[in-house]
């Protein structure tokens, strides 16, 4: 990301990717989304398929999926650039690009056997999606100890019993990856991951009523049988199998919140430049100028932290701490920026003809998802206090 002069900028191919997604969002996605109800969670099947075809035609399909499996195979830095731009729509907090770019299967699925990849291949082909089930009613931030869902080995299969909670996308998905405890171990070594097929008996869903534009589920397993060939990795090694994937999900997650906040700031700047109060433009008032300036400072800093984490990952470095730093600062800064933007708009800031109040609600959850800020602060502090200093 540095050229011979020592200046810092994105590689040319990623600038081109950013500009292509930005144009696609403005020219293709926004006109479709503008016709939807304010709190719509998904597009209807026909307009979604039409958008997905257009995205495929310009090479913007399943951006995280490796090229050999039909996706764009972006680096983690590329995924962050794409995530920021694809989030700049009303439903961007949970459905990037309104689903136009497909729904990448969990990357960990590609580490499985060809048989285990069957559902992931269908998702890439058909634009459908999967779910990942880790959190439980007993806890989510410490899954190694809180997972109570059990998988009991019986001959050539496992029988799963238990409940998962806060599972995004489970209602739309045909399959998922579930983490369950096998054997007597109480810690991470007892966790195994499995491919689960929603069409088989023994699995049921119940929707959790939360904010209007978000639809998580409880996923219940009642003597659900999984053949041994659908166990991902070795028994008791579920987290070891997926740990890198879970860590690498954090920079793009933070990047998406930055994209939403940037879109909010762009709206606020445009509003301040034309709205008058007390005889002059809002943009001429120091209070407004400082809110805009503070927002710009925070977004630039957050973006660079995300890019640093992704860049280090692409170089093969351990980014456990970098990812936590980017996730904490990115999600919290994004929330502060949208809060300021609502203040700049005044009463219009919570009007449903604008996306600001929806973004405000949804960004609040982002400080909890993918690990709450407090847990990531623990990760950062332990690194600093250990004397090993894995981070930068």
Model-based region annotation:
Residues 139-143, 158:
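Hydrophobic, small-residue-rich alpha-helical packing segments that form membrane-like cores
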Residues 146-147, 199-225:
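Flexible, small-/acidic-enriched active-site or ligand-binding loops
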Residues 103-111, 132-133, 185:
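Flexible, glycine-rich active-site loops centered on histidine and acidic residues
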Residues 217-242:
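A short, charged helix-loop
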Residues 140, 165-171, 211, 248-252, ...:
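Glycine-rich phosphate/pyrophosphate-binding beta-alpha loops
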Residues 148, 156-157, 161-204:
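A short core secondary-structure module
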Residues 1-89, 93-94, 99, 111-115, ...:
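Alpha-helical interface subdomain recognition
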Residues 126-135:
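A short, Trp-centered hydrophobic/proline-enriched beta-strand micro-motif
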